[in-house]
Amino acid sequence: MKNKKSSKVLEELLSRSDYLVVQGNDLAKSFGNLKAFEHKLLDYCFSFVTKDSKPEERFTLKIAELLKYLGLTSSGTNYERVIRAFKVLNENTALYLPIEENGVKGIMMTQLFGYINYLETGLVHFEFSKYAQPYVFDLRKNFYSFKLRELARIKGKYALILLKLWEASRFRDNRITLINGTLEEWQTWFLGSEKRLTAGKFMQNIIKRAAEELEEKLNIEIILDTKKDGRKVVGYEMEIIDKRQPDLTIFE
């Protein structure tokens, strides 16, 4: 027997894009609440995963190498900054995964990391949680194709998020990628589930700023189509053209 109130709550949770992770590329859209430094640290952690990575694999990060990659000095202040960022990642990367037991739908509430161990030698050992691993591995294998050196050039938080959205929506090395979403979905991807802006401010302060940074630092062109219901903005379709890839239409 189903509980009607419980079923309604579950349906609401399942319909919210900020809650549900159903495949690897959804993981790229899940952490809009993180700051730019935390996004860079998370991407650095993801970079340890390769096609040969094994379940329950333990990864080791050297803070000195991380700081060098970030262009920061090996000072006590920066070491502390890294540890604080790991603390934020540990506390703010909750995952909500769809489950089904004996034909009954539900949600598993879990987290991205199984553990993060910091040692006074400057080493950090971490493991992705048992239930997050398949999504992390799928993300790295099928979606994330940019290199750490490319990530290092991107400074803004929103540009980093847009870069991830691009990779999460892209099929292999396609020249053209379309990203579609409602205004609510776009705001969730960039701002998380708590903060909201007017459509005008969101366009000017978030999307425009992110797009301009990627166009400036990567060889791409971004075209945005604003979807409206009358005068009300209801969503966006973004076309990203990767000029590094050949334009096959010239041969048609």
Set out the residue ranges of the language-model regions.
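Charged, alpha-helix-forming regions
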Residues: 1-252
